[in-house]
Amino acid sequence: MLLIPAIDLKDGQCVRLKQGDMDQATIFSEEPAAMARHWVDRGARRLHLVDLNGAFAGKPKNEDAIRAIIAEVGGEIPVQLGGGIRDLNTIERYLDDGLSYVIIGTAAVKNPGFLQDACTAFGGHIIVGLDAKDGKVATDGWSKLTGHEVADLARKFEDYGCESIIYTDIGRDGMLQGINIEATVRLARAVKIPVIASGGLSNLADIESLCEVEDEGIEGVICGRAIYSGDLDFAAAQTLADRLRESDDA
């Protein structure tokens, strides 16, 4: 089970939002590259970046901070990025800069042809981010709820050739209410590609619960507010996940 620290970027700073509200941002660091180093030094094996300004603007907005993070840790672990990725040129530029994966969210739902083209052109590097509430997909930085069932879209995007799916329960994100295990497992069972859980991770009990269902196809979990607030010790959590995996394999 990969525990993946999230670095959310707003105006060049590392922040956390409460339920996706740009007006409810807590600044955790003015040096995102140093924050990336912090998590790698504590055992992170992948990083999850979000260009928040980009997500709302529909185009890249934190490229300097993103490049600084890649320069700091990109040679050691995979780095994935979402937010504001709406065209193939942006994907190509980011991959050339050293990103391992780009995450397509709103654009995948609104323009499936773009996702299909991206998967064809950059196979193995495209992750789809599906944000949902009560099983329905949301777009545009969570501001719009669609009528699409998350499992239906996930199967469609799997057919296009995406590498994996990040599933965020937006009713829980940034609220420390616990991962929605049931909904995440339901999605993982609907597809054959890996699912990465997101939204609401709060403590070691959540890690244990996720590890119990890892074999359903859940590859990892995005770690957000809990590792910044101190509710979850990242290094201890990754160690626990590794130990549980080893005991399962034994």
Swiss-Prot record:
A GO BP entry is: L-tryptophan biosynthetic process
What EC identifiers does the entry list? 5.3.1.16
Q: Where in the cell is the protein located?
A: Cytoplasm
Which spans are transmembrane here?
none
Recorded hits in Pfam families, A to Z, give: His_biosynth
What's its catalytic activity? 1-(5-phospho-beta-D-ribosyl)-5-[(5-phospho-beta-D-ribosylamino)methylideneamino]imidazole-4-carboxamide = 5-[(5-phospho-1-deoxy-D-ribulos-1-ylimino)methylamino]-1-(5-phospho-beta-D-ribosyl)imidazole-4-carboxamide
The answer to whether UniProt assigns keyword Cytoplasm to this entry is: yes
User: SUPFAM superfamilies attached here?
Assistant: Ribulose-phoshate binding barrel (SSF51366)
Annotated Gene3D superfamilies: Aldolase class I (3.20.20.70)
Q: What are the positions of the active site?
A: D8 (proton acceptor), D131 (proton donor)
**Similarity remark:** Belongs to the HisA/HisF family.
Protein name listed in UniProt: 1-(5-phosphoribosyl)-5-[(5-phosphoribosylamino)methylideneamino] imidazole-4-carboxamide isomerase
Which organism does this sequence originate in?
Paraburkholderia xenovorans (strain LB400)
Gene name tied to this protein = hisA
